């Protein structure tokens, strides 16, 4: 479609074999010839108009100079009689009035021309539309004909598109050139507010035409706009498409002020050089470069000339940057003009669409948006380790369902470990406080920090330690913390099951990690049930360390006593907290059950403690969670309420404060677990013991645990690292009798849970820690961890037990049941026990 020299060549060459090509070449040739003729006519017309404008300007200047001279002469001849002076003054006034009238008449003429221009433009638009309709119809017909006669003839000639481009485009060019040029000519003087529209129309007129014609029209329009805006028009000196500017009337563009190339010299309109300078290239570039300034000058000049309000209005129009001026600035490249115009149109249409942007954020409230993104935030920390990711996910699910706030906290967490800690603490706080238990883990953390700054500090220290121990543990812990918080709150009940599901794989991972020395994230369920304060050494190894932290945070909020704060220190409420992380997790539900006065819950806690370490334990944990939730609801125990939660979280402090020990004692392992794991090997046990010792030493060094609390947390076995001791503990556990409460708080724990006070306690702690480690290692000491978890529930300090006689530990023969359970779970466990 785009005319090219080839088209002209075709026209000159003998008829081509194809009729379509001949027809196409002929219209193109005619169009090119017509365009050249139009260009010449435009140039000639422009020259003549410029000359006429120059003459008119000179005439005006002559008259003005004459008036000035006469006035000067009159002033000089002041010696003359007053009457003659008066007569002269009257004559001068009359002349001035005549000049003013002339100016006014000229202004009125300009306004009329503008009106005519507008009318013509309207007519031109109508004609354009009609022509476009014709072209469209022709194209449609052409398409139909093409489908029928595609092989016989070229569709283009029959379409009439080329004919239209030849004739219709000629008519379009006529309409655009004649109508719009007249418009421009009439409007340029009046600040050509029509010129922008005209330019646009000219472009539209040129659209049907070939690209070359469009370029010519655009160029012409740009020049016209420049002239209208006061920019020097591209006159004869510019041989380009200025001639396309068809100016029917004397173009008032020559009445605009001229600015020299450097922009320093400004020639006001009524100047002798103006008419000639308008055509001078000296002012062309400068004026083109500063179309807006030219427009302003034009407005000023028009106001000076006309001095009328009408001209002022026109000036205002001219001063406004018109599309024409913008186009004139970019006229050097018609393609750029076209692109800019299209862009502006597109932007105009796209702006309203931008209102849809709010849809990107469903909630305008930033908090809600954060909540919506909380899952992402939670997952990011979880990414540290698979176990952590699962735990974080679970915690996120639990926390977010319970309350949207946790997601905000999640968003705030920088390290996953810190975040999980905060979330645990916050969740604990939320439990204590009416805040949604799972919701503001961060808020709960803040509350905890406020309520128990000391405990919070130890917890943070513990977390730091855990992080030092292994980054895996800290992410895991954070995940566990978040998971634990969901578990801990009854509202999180649904979330904990999910966590359980996640936890089972996590447990496996955690076991492996603990073997590696990095504790896998504690199953969210366990962590939820009993967030164990993370211990320096065992925490990273124990799955429940994060839970201990969470629980510790909860306990911190609820139990400010030194014991609990010490527990809250990274280790958790109890020294066993970390070791018992899994047990604590189970314990969490068990504690809840105890608080609720549900022996079944306590048993579940045992099972839960086992679960803590194993996938099956996850199921048990779920049961424990359910039972504990029920217990919370029915008993309204500490877990039922926010305070109850911390009590459940810190079994020792919580049990003592809330009489958890009673429930722990009351509950006999009623459920026979089918999900028991194999017992840990002696090597694993020894390793866990070593870990426990290290943690214990850290705790002691840090002074995290008060004397009474550290004892339960660090059971004698926790201090003991020998495998024989561990096996002895197991044996005593399986031994038969559960000694009531022994003098040692730790022994109380173990005795209540396992039947042998000392061995049980040491086992509980040792197993808790070592199990946490070995369980993550998949060593199979989950049974111990389960018991330990149960023990922590029961591991209420002796004073607590005494304070709460209802919670007094009951003597039970657990060895038989435990043996059966172990046998059900794995024969290797029993073998280990017997060998020990």
Swiss-Prot record:
Q: Where is the composition biased (Low complexity)?
A: 318-335
Compositional bias of kind Polar residues: 407-417
Molecular functions per Gene Ontology: beta-catenin binding; delta-catenin binding; histone deacetylase binding; protein kinase A binding; protein kinase C binding; RNA polymerase II-specific DNA-binding transcription factor binding
According to its UniProt entry, the function of this protein is described as: Involved in regulation of intracellular signaling pathways during development. Specifically thought to play a role in canonical and/or non-canonical Wnt signaling pathways through interaction with DSH (Dishevelled) family proteins. The activation/inhibition of Wnt signaling may depend on the phosphorylation status. Proposed to regulate the degradation of CTNNB1/beta-catenin, thereby modulating the transcriptional activation of target genes of the Wnt signaling pathway. Its function in stabilizing CTNNB1 may involve inhibition of GSK3B activity. Promotes the membrane localization of CTNNB1.
Q: Which disease is it linked to?
A: Neural tube defects: Congenital malformations of the central nervous system and adjacent structures related to defective neural tube closure during the first trimester of pregnancy. Failure of neural tube closure can occur at any level of the embryonic axis. Common NTD forms include anencephaly, myelomeningocele and spina bifida, which result from the failure of fusion in the cranial and spinal region of the neural tube. NTDs have a multifactorial etiology encompassing both genetic and environmental components.
| Phenotype upon changing residue 45 to W | In NTD; uncertain significance; does not affect interaction with DVL2; does not affect subcellular location; increases RHOA activation but decreases the ability to activate JNK
| This protein's name | Dapper homolog 1
Q: Where in the cell is it found?
A: Cytoplasm; Nucleus; Synapse
**Species for this entry:** Homo sapiens
According to its UniProt entry, one GO biological process term is: negative regulation of transcription by RNA polymerase II
Give me the gene this protein comes from: DACT1
Span(s) of short sequence motif PDZ-binding: 826-836
Hydrolase found in the keyword field:
no
| Ranges spanned by the short sequence motif Nuclear export signal, renumbered to the chain | 132-141
One Pfam match, by short name?
Dapper
Region spans: Required for self-association: 92-156
| Basic residues biased stretches | 623-633
Q: What is known of its domains?
A: The C-terminal PDZ-binding motif mediates interaction with the PDZ domains of DSH (Dishevelled) family proteins.
Q: Where is this region: Disordered?
A: 1-47, 316-335, 350-374, 401-521, 588-679
């Amino acid at each position: 479609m785009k005319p090219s020299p080839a088209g002209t060549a075709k026209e000159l060459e003998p008829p081509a074999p194809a009729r379509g090509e001949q027809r196409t070449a002929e219209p193109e040739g005619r169009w090119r010839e017509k365009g050249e003729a139009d260009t010449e006519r435009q140039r000639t017309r422009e020259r003549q108009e410029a000359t006429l404008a120059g003459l008119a300007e000179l005439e005006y200047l002559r008259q003005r100079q004459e008036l000035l001279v006469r006035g000067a002469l009159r002033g000089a001849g002041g010696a003359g009689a007053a009457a003659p002076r008066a007569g002269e003054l009257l004559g001068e006034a009359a002349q001035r009035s005549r000049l003013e009238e002339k100016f006014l008449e000229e202004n009125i003429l300009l306004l009329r021309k503008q009106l005519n221009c507008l009318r013509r433009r309207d007519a031109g638009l109508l004609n354009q539309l009609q022509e476009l309709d014709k072209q469209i119809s022709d194209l449609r017909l052409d398409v139909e004909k093409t489908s029928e006669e595609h092989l016989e003839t070229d569709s283009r000639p029959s379409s009439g598109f080329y004919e239209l481009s030849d004739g219709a485009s000629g008519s379009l060019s006529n309409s655009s050139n004649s109508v719009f040029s007249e418009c421009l000519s009439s409007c340029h003087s009046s600040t050509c507010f029509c010129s922008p529209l005209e330019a646009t129309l000219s472009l539209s007129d040129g659209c049907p035409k070939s690209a070359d014609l469009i370029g010519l029209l655009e160029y012409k329009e740009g020049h016209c706009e420049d002239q209208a805006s006061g920019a020097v028009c591209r006159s004869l000196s510019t041989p380009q498409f200025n001639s396309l500017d068809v100016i029917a009337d004397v173009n008032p563009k020559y009445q605009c002020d001229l600015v020299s190339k450097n922009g320093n010299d400004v020639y006001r309109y009524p100047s002798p050089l103006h008419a000639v300078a308008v055509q001078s290239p000296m002012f062309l570039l400068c004026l083109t470069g500063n179309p807006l300034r030219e427009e302003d000058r034009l407005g000023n000049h028009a106001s000076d000339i006309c001095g009328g309000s009408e001209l002022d209005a026109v000036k205002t129009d001219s001063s406004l940057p018109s599309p024409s001026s913008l186009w004139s600035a970019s006229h050097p490249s018609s393609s750029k003009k076209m692109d800019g115009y299209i862009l502006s149109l597109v932007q105009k249409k796209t702006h309203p669409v931008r209102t849809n942007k709010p849809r990107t954020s469903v909630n305008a409230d930033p908090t809600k948006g954060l909540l919506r993104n909380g899952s992402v935030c939670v997952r990011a920390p979880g990414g540290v380790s698979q176990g952590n990711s699962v735990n974080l996910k679970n915690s996120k699910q639990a926390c977010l369902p319970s309350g949207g706030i946790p997601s905000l906290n999640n968003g705030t967490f920088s390290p996953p470990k810190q975040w999980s800690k905060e979330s645990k603490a916050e969740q604990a706080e939320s439990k204590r406080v009416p805040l949604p238990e799972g919701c503001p883990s961060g808020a709960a953390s803040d509350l905890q920090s406020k309520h128990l700054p000391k405990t919070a500090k130890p917890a943070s220290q513990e977390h730091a330690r855990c992080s030092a121990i292994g980054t895996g543990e800290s992410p895991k812990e954070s995940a566990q913390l978040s998971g634990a918080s969901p578990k801990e709150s009854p509202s999180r009940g649904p979330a904990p099951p999910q966590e359980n599901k996640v936890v089972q794989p996590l447990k496996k991972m955690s076991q492996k990690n603990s073997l590696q020395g990095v504790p896998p994230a504690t199953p969210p369920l366990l962590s939820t049930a009993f967030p164990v304060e993370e211990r320096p050494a065992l925490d990273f190894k124990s799955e429940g360390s994060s839970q201990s932290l969470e629980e510790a945070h909860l306990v911190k909020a609820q139990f400010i006593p030194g014991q609990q704060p010490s527990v809250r220190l990274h280790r958790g409420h109890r020294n066993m907290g970390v070791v018992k992380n899994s047990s604590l997790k189970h314990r969490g539900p068990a504690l809840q059950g105890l608080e609720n006065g549900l022996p079944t819950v306590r048993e579940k806690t045992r099972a839960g403690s086992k679960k803590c370490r194993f996938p099956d334990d996850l199921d048990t944990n779920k049961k424990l969670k359910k039972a504990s939730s029920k217990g919370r609801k029915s008993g309204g125990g500490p877990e039922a309420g926010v305070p109850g939660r911390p009590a459940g979280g810190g079994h020792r402090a919580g049990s003592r404060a809330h009489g958890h020990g009673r429930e722990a004692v009351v509950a006999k392992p009623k459920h026979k677990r089918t999900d028991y794991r194999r017992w840990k090997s002696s090597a694993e046990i020894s390793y866990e013991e070593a870990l426990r010792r290290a943690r214990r030493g850290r705790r002691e060094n840090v002074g995290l645990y008060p004397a009474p609390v550290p004892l339960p947390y660090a059971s004698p076995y926790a201090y003991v690292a020998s495998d024989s001791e561990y096996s002895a503990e197991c044996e005593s556990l399986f031994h038969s009798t559960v000694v009531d409460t022994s003098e040692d708080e730790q022994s109380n724990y173990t005795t209540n849970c396992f039947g042998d006070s000392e061995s049980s306690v040491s086992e509980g702690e040792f197993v808790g820690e070592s199990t946490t480690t070995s369980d993550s290692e998949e060593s199979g000491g989950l049974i111990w961890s389960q018991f330990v978890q149960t023990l922590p529930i029961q591991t209420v300090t002796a004073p607590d037990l005494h304070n709460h006689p209802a919670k007094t530990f009951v003597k039970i023969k657990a060895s038989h049941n435990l043996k059966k359970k172990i046998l059900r779970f794995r024969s290797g466990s029993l073998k280990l026990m017997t060998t020990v």
